[in-house]
Amino acid sequence: MKTSKEITINKKNKFGAEILCIGSEILLGNIVNTNSQWIAAQLAILGIPHFRQTVIGDNPARLEEAILEASNRSEILITTGGLGPTPDDIKTKVIADTFKTPLEQRNDILIDLRNKSKDKVSKLSESQKKQSLVPKGAKIINNYSGTAPGIFWSPKENFTILTFPGVPSELKEMWAKEASKLLISNNLSKEVISSKVLHFAGITESLLADKIQHLLISKNPTVATYASTGSVKVRITARGKSSEKTNRLIEPIKKELTQITGLKCFGLDNETLEEIVFKLLLKRKETIAVAESCTGGGIGSKLTKIPGSSQIFHGGVIAYNNSIKQRLLGVPEEIINTHGAVSKQVVESMARGVQIKFKVNWAISVSGIAGPTGGSKSKPVGLVNFCIKGPKTLITWEENFGSNKTREDIQKLSVLNALDRLRLSIIMAN
């Protein structure tokens, strides 16, 4: 059986890119590896297919093995981590040793290191100087925010390696300013891959898939559904020689999707429900307040994450205790005693109360049993009541999200459900 160092693959079979992330802290679960996800998205933008992601610890032998294997099956290897002045920053030396290439000290890196040092000292420590050593013949990818530069190097035919530090902000800046341009100028970018994401609420993934079954079998562009708590995403992805070509492929599919689903589609790409609600209220020059009992301020939190939210959001009351509902929102004790805190009658009274208290156009209230305790046969865990009160709108409704959900899931579903109904109510008011 051949070892990894003896593996040979015909260069014609080599294709695409792979990602290698280095760091024992990733393997141990101490930090989340967001770099791979981000790089994968950037490769897609450049039209570079990628088929493998690997994580290894700070071990020279395993690193050399991983680099050799990648060089025999892929055209491009992108690495993160393992760069810097500390003893476990071993990547550059291992890469050079793997391809039997000497390291050379780069004066331009030394000058940059001195300029970035706090006191601009002329003498650098040996650990700092280590960062100026790169394989002979490699191009430098400058690090604008940190000290450890990356390299762009083709140590063998039909194979290029790019190295980056593990700090996400440094990686992203180096990629945007230099690495992506190097990939394009060296003809490593094959085609353009463009995507458009549509967001849906108030519909399950299976029901949505049934409605768009004929689109899901499309080859270019491809159409795929992805479910998350309370919402569904549909990603349309097209390949072509230019972004103009891919956009022309995507547009008719996007148009058909929105025609089929109507108001179930609430946003595109990075748009969120709260942003859509914010824009709708801002356009109408109207305001809102919230009264929350089981969501712990989750609705208000979503709305106030948006810059400029004070233009539409006046405030809210988080009323878990019944006496707070009575004192701050004016909910009659008789209604609570007769119908219970989790009831349509109580949420309607809460919405009316917060609308008056904050002098707003719109009010939304919620009261439910998020669990894991507190449920009963008539009012189980997962039961949530809502109310929306607008200028000419009064809607109360009940949802049962199920007792098998976690407290966090029930709260999240309640927030998303409330925001989506609010979105629809404002649209209908128009």
Swiss-Prot record:
Coiled coil: none annotated. InterPro entries: CinA, CinA-like_C, CinA_C, CinA_KH, Competence-induced_CinA, MoaB/Mog-like_dom_sf, MoaB/Mog_dom. It comes from the Bacteria. Belongs to the CinA family. HAMAP family: CinA_B. PANTHER family: NICOTINAMIDE-NUCLEOTIDE AMIDOHYDROLASE PNCC, NMN AMIDOHYDROLASE-LIKE PROTEIN YFAY. This is CinA-like protein. It comes from Prochlorococcus marinus (strain NATL2A).
